Amino acid sequence: MTTNNQNAVTVTVTGAGGQIGYSLLFRIAKGEVFGDRVVNLRLLETEQGVQAARGVALELADCAFPLLGEVSITTELSEGFKDANAVFLVGAKPRQKGEERADLLAANGKIFGPQGKAIAEYAADDVRVIVVGNPANTNAAIVAAHAEGLDPRRVTALTRLDHNRGLAQVADKLGVAVRDLKNMTVWGNHSASQFPDVAELTLNGEKVADKLDAAWVNDEFIPRVAKRGAEIIEVRGRSSAASAASAALDHMRDWVNGTAEGDWVSVALPSDGSYGIPEGLVFSFPCRSVDGEWEIVQGLEISPAQQERIDANIKELQEEKAAVEEAGLL
């Protein structure tokens, strides 16, 4: 189906032929993020990934989604980001065995820098960008730094997966439904240092921190959420794909349509100095989406124990930033 519907939304997905892209695209085309708006999809791939993207495009056509408009495949950034209203930056170089994190940061910087420049030049003025490819926080910082003229708050990184993992772990521990839990927070970096925080988490409006044993929170919950990706690789033999895609959809849907009443979610975005986080550092905060814009939740009390974990994330992200600066990518 091809349409010139004036209310259509253009969505770009990089790494569209990969596992996460495959899990993402059909749900976007079905209307899970943008409601009843027609969706035009731009599948942006490397030369090596084009064939897989073609296969995805064939399957998208075979689904006969009523809301699916045009589907295009390209390797050119100018074509891939043209008039994009929403961008999912999924494609990234995976870490190889024996590779140092600094090497990974430098390699991905060479991918995300040009993408940031092209987004600023070719995407729609209202573009919303979510970086899924790891290391997501620092990749997002690189995108924002190269997207000259674009409001840095239009560029975010995915920590909703960690947020969702935290909700699932607490729901399982308490024997309750995930839907009854609100105000989970993930602070910091999408890495093993992240701080999933239950201090403000509520069950049917009542805080649950007192119902959770401190030893379980510190020794089991926090490490398990932080290392869940490695656990899934160990069990499944592949990295998280469907859950990562689902979290990215949650993130974009809430950004566009607003967060649920009385709840907040976790979003990594350039800091405005809130909670003492250095300005500009891409850091995960508790956020609400209001009128299509992310707002950091203010006024939460931070204990010394919480601050220690937050500080560890600041340190790690500053070290990542220094590594890409040294490589001339920031």
From Swiss-Prot:
Reactions catalysed, as given in the entry: (S)-malate + NAD(+) = oxaloacetate + NADH + H(+)
Binding annotation for substrate: 95, 101, 134, 165
MF annotations from Gene Ontology: L-malate dehydrogenase (NAD+) activity
Binding residue positions for NAD(+): 15-21, 108, 115, 132-134
GO biological process: malate metabolic process; tricarboxylic acid cycle
UniProt entry tagged with the keyword Oxidoreductase: yes
SUPFAM superfamilies: LDH C-terminal domain-like, NAD(P)-binding Rossmann-fold domains
CDD domains named among the record's database cross-references: MDH_chloroplast-like
Entries under NCBIfam families matching the protein: MalateDH-SF1, PRK05442.1
Family that this chain belongs to: Belongs to the LDH/MDH superfamily. MDH type 2 family.
Name listed for the protein in its UniProt record: Malate dehydrogenase
Organism: Corynebacterium jeikeium (strain K411)
